[in-house]
Each structure stands twice: as structure tokens, then as C-alpha cells.
């Protein structure tokens, strides 16, 4: 049997690493939000810088997830919900992968190949919503060690934003087909939009995983 204080220390240690992981993902998301303005300014140097920085963040997130895996293995049954914690860590890591993927595609986007279209503004709006979801997710993870009930409540805001992303994704996809003449333009923009939408979906999945942890605390 483990003492309650030992269990509490073990829980705090693992949740601290999970919080570091979520924070690093948020930093990457914020850089993604800076990538789009750089695209509109046709600032290729800035685009490349952001893409490289986000790739570094993706590596950092993977390392933190590996650290958490080792920690959970060492603590063993002392952490009763370790499978749930590990699942959440993998879900958060996957968000970083989608952010990196979207940033890479934006960095390779050739603005000069596109006619002026309000669709780019709509794309920026979807990106902003997805980044806001990552911010809210970070708040949820932080709340785990302070007030698990609050963490559960905060996930509702993530669900609401995800529905907005879905609505804008569908509307933007229809606009692509009706407003763009070039099949190449449609494919490129649709690819970017899908990556951002996948990022939002993954945020919701991670929030669900964290809710399971909160229910056990």
C-alpha cells in the first residue's frame, strides 16, 4: 500500500509534466497564429522561421511525452489513473503534429499564385478559432491540479469553439468550390483548411481525455 502523501506527490509530478506538454503546444499554436499574417505579407523569411520554430516545439512535446511515459512506468500502480494520463499525453502530442503540419503547408503557400480572394480572411478566422481551442485546452490542463471540477466545466468552452470551427470549415469548403476557378487553388487551400480542422478535432479529443482524468481526481 502507498501512503496518501506519496500518491499525491506522484500525481502532482505526472500532472506537472502534462502541463508542461500542453504549455509547449500552446506556444506552437501561438506561432501558428503569427504564421498567417506573415503569409499575407508575403514574408517568406518569417514563414520559414515560424515553421522551423514550430517543428522544434513538436520535438519538445514528444520529449515531454516520453518523459511522462518513463515517469509513469517508474511510479507504477502509485498513479491509479496512469493509462488515462498517458492517453491524454498522446492526444496533446498529436495536436502539436497537426500544428506543425499546418505551419509547413502555410510556409509553402505561394500567395502570388492566387488571385485576391476573401477566402484567405476566412481561413485566418478558422486558424484563430483553432488556436483559441489550444489556449482553452491549456487552461483545462492547468486546472487539473487546482480544481478538477473547473477543468470539467472549462471543456464545455472547447466544445463550443469546435462547433464553430466545424461550421466555418463546411462553409469555407463550399466557398472554395464556388469562388475559385483553379483546381490547384482549391486543392491547396482545402488541404490547409483540413489540417487546421484536424487540429481542432484533436483538441476536442484531448479535452475529453483530460475530462476522464479530472473525474478520477
Residue locations for each model-derived region?
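Cytosolic, long alpha-helical scaffolding segments
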Residues: 1-217
Amino acid at each position: 500500500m502507498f501512503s496518501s502523501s506519496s500518491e499525491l506527490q506522484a500525481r502532482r509530478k505526472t500532472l506537472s509534466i502534462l502541463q508542461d506538454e500542453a504549455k509547449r503546444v500552446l506556444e506552437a499554436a501561438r506561432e501558428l497564429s503569427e504564421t498567417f499574417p506573415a503569409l499575407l505579407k508575403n514574408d517568406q523569411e518569417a514563414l520559414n522561421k515560424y515553421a522551423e520554430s514550430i517543428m522544434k516545439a513538436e520535438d519538445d512535446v514528444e520529449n515531454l511525452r516520453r518523459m511522462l511515459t518513463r515517469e509513469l512506468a517508474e511510479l507504477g500502480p502509485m498513479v491509479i489513473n496512469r493509462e488515462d494520463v498517458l492517453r491524454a499525453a498522446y492526444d496533446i502530442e498529436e495536436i502539436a503534429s497537426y500544428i506543425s503540419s499546418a505551419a509547413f503547408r502555410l510556409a509553402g503557400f505561394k500567395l502570388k499564385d492566387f488571385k485576391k480572394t476573401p477566402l484567405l480572411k476566412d481561413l485566418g478566422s478558422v486558424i484563430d478559432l483553432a488556436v483559441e481551442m489550444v489556449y482553452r485546452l491549456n487552461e483545462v490542463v492547468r486546472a487539473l491540479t487546482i480544481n478538477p471540477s473547473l477543468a470539467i466545466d472549462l471543456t464545455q468552452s472547447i466544445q463550443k469553439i469546435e462547433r464553430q470551427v466545424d461550421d466555418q470549415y463546411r462553409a469555407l469548403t463550399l466557398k472554395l468550390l464556388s469562388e475559385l476557378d483553379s483546381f490547384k487553388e482549391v486543392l491547396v487551400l482545402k488541404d490547409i483548411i483540413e489540417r487546421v480542422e484536424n487540429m481542432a478535432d484533436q483538441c476536442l479529443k484531448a479535452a475529453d481525455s483530460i475530462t476522464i482524468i479530472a473525474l478520477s481526481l
